[in-house]
A protein has these predicted regions:
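Conserved small/polar residues in nucleotide/adenosyl-binding loops
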Residues: 528-535
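Bacterial Sec-dependent N-terminal signal peptides
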Residues: 1-24
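Structured mid-domain segments that build the active-site/substrate or prosthetic-cofactor binding neighborhood
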Residues: 342-440
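Substrate-binding cleft/loops of secretory-pathway carbohydrate-active enzymes
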Residues: 305-327, 372-376, 405-411
Length: 538
């Protein structure tokens, strides 16, 4: 009996092993395609997903997987199509079936495309880093293991600025969107003057616009008198015509123009503001009326500057989206850890108590000195996790995305990854990027980042969006550290001296350091500084 049990156990083990082996799918063998890409549902997204997969399989193996539709699937095929509701919008399921097929099903929108990206990245060794910058290992045979992988994005909308977005594959790879993808006529922020242009309505109807210092003031940056019923009627007429021109799109922004303390202070508006404890109350009352008038549409509005804090009483309807902006916050530590950030966190937590439809516009950019060091990599993950925790469903990270900006490629890489999954290891993301993008120079540039980060925190000097290198000349950009940074860049360049592509990337990444040196060098030396130096010398 004991031998029988051992024999049965061995048979079960062999069966399990054989099942595991048979669950593998070979796409290419000895340079020849052995699989097909089958479109279960023929639509634009699935076709784009199929083409992306076909393209990269060919780059890896030189073999072309045929794309077919309206045909019976067979063993070894990759099936693109089908619904996986649990994955959510843009999510997907990769699953090896009992018929030895790989099913890529979608939770909606671009889920099938993102499923292909995950397949290429996680199981076929393709890594994408920046515009037209990727790595792969050529293979004559491509075999996939048994797969069961479901992913749901942390946010339904993910956006960042980057020159890399000019590469259509990059944009898909990092699962990024643009306002034009979501918002009707690209109307996603500061839209009051687009909906009711003051040039058109201001002369005849000045009462539509903010009452400030005793008079209504039409203008490109003026706000609306939100308690005036004629403003609501005029806005409805304008919006109705916009919706009819774009019947297939759902979302639009009805939001204040840029500028602070420009909201209407007529007696009626002021009364609502005082009752609600914030000018946002007027906005939400107005937006709720629009949301009731057009229940099949979604309206986004700003919680920005004067309207950042939530109202005390009125609650946004489910189809009212709150775009909350943290423009006034410092960036050297996470938002939860500095005074300016705490005001924003208070607002975020307040909005999250009355809405689960929040869009956060976060800033990681230096507007005044765009080509200068901005070492905020250590706060990215904590801030994005904070947003996720507080019912944020849409996220825009406004960063310096220009070529030659402060590690702009790495910043976009990390943000793209973290907006999809905020609970990845951020330091591992940095190391992975550096190793893939900078090659043998990576250790030196990693040291550069960590030394500058530590110096920033030790200096006590805030990092903000209107910063200057000069303000850090006694801190993270002091002469001793500048010497260290340059030595690290020298070592980085030497490490890849024989590779012109990698060398060029390092030289571009050095520009912010060089810019800082030039800015600091042209700083006037004050008389007080000279006297202090003379005193120390004597």
């Amino acid at each position: 009996m004991k031998q029988l049990i051992q024999c049965m156990g061995m048979l079960m083990l062999l069966f399990a092993l054989s099942s595991r082996v048979s669950a593998q799918i070979t796409l290419v063998k000895d340079g020849k395609a052995t699989s097909r890409i089958v479109l279960v549902e023929k639509n634009e997204v699935n076709e784009q997903a199929a083409t992306l997969l076909q393209d990269f399989v060919k780059r890896i193996s030189q073999a072309t997987l045929p794309i077919v539709a309206d045909t019976k699937a067979r063993s070894g095929d990759i099936l693109i199509g089908g619904k996986q509701a649990s994955a959510g919008e843009d999510g997907f399921l990769l699953k090896t079936t009992a018929n030895e097929q790989l099913q890529i099903s979608s939770g909606g929108d671009k889920g099938a495309i993102y499923g292909v990206v995950s397949l290429l990245e996680q199981y076929m060794g393709v890594s994408y880093f920046a515009k037209e910058a990727y790595t792969l290992t050529p293979m004559q045979t491509i075999t996939l293991p048994a797969i069961h992988r479901e992913e749901t994005p942390a946010f339904r909308y993910r956006q960042t600025y980057s020159y890399n977005n000019d590469d259509p594959v990059y944009k898909l790879w990092f699962r990024l969107e643009e306002p034009k993808d979501m918002f009707i006529e690209n109307m996603w922020v500061h839209t009051f003057n687009r909906i009711l242009p003051s040039d058109r309505f201001g002369k005849e109807h000045p009462e539509y616009y903010s009452f400030i210092n005793g008079e209504h003031r039409p203008g490109h940056n003026s706000q609306w008198c939100l308690t005036n019923p004629k403003v609501f009627d005029a806005a409805v007429r304008q919006l109705d015509s916009i919706f009819k021109a774009h019947p297939d799109m759902k979302m639009i922004s009805v939001s204040q123009n840029d500028g602070n303390n420009t909201n209407c202070s007529c007696p009626a508006c002021k009364e609502v503001d005082e009752y609600e404890g914030s000018p946002s109350g007027n906005l939400i009352q107005f937006l709720n009326k629009l949301a009731e008038r057009f229940p099949d549409k979604e309206f986004s509005t700003l919680a920005y500057l004067y309207s950042m804090q939530p109202p005390k009483h009125v609650k946004p309807l489910s189809n009212v989206n709150i775009m909350l902006c943290d423009i006034d916050c410092k960036r050297e530590v996470p938002l939860t850890d500095n005074a300016s950030g705490r005001d924003f966190v208070k607002a975020l937590e307040g909005w999250s108590k009355i809405s689960d439809n929040i869009f956060v516009w976060d800033y990681g950019i230096n507007f005044d000195n765009i080509v200068s060091p901005f070492p905020n990599f250590h706060i990215l993950q904590k801030n994005i996790q904070l947003f996720k925790k507080n019912h944020v469903t849409m996220h825009f990270s406004q960063v310096n995305g220009i070529r030659g900006g402060d590690f702009s490629e790495m910043r976009a890489y990390m943000i793209g990854k973290l907006m999809w999954d905020p609970y990845q290891n951020a330091d591992s993301l940095m190391r992975t990027f550096m190793n893939g993008y900078y090659g043998a120079a990576a250790p030196y540039l990693y040291q550069y980042q960590k030394i500058m980060q530590g110096a920033l925190l030790a200096s006590g000097q805030p990092l903000w969006i209107y910063d200057s290198p000069i303000s850090h000349k006694n801190g993270m950009l002091n002469p001793v550290l500048l010497k260290t940074y340059n030595e690290l860049f020298d070592q980085a360049e030497e490490a890849v001296a024989g590779d012109t592509v990698l060398l060029r990337r390092i030289q571009l990444s050095r520009l912010p350091l060089q810019y800082s040196e030039l800015e600091i060098a042209r700083t006037p030396v004050s008389y007080t500084h000279l006297r202090a130096h003379e005193t120390r010398s004597n």
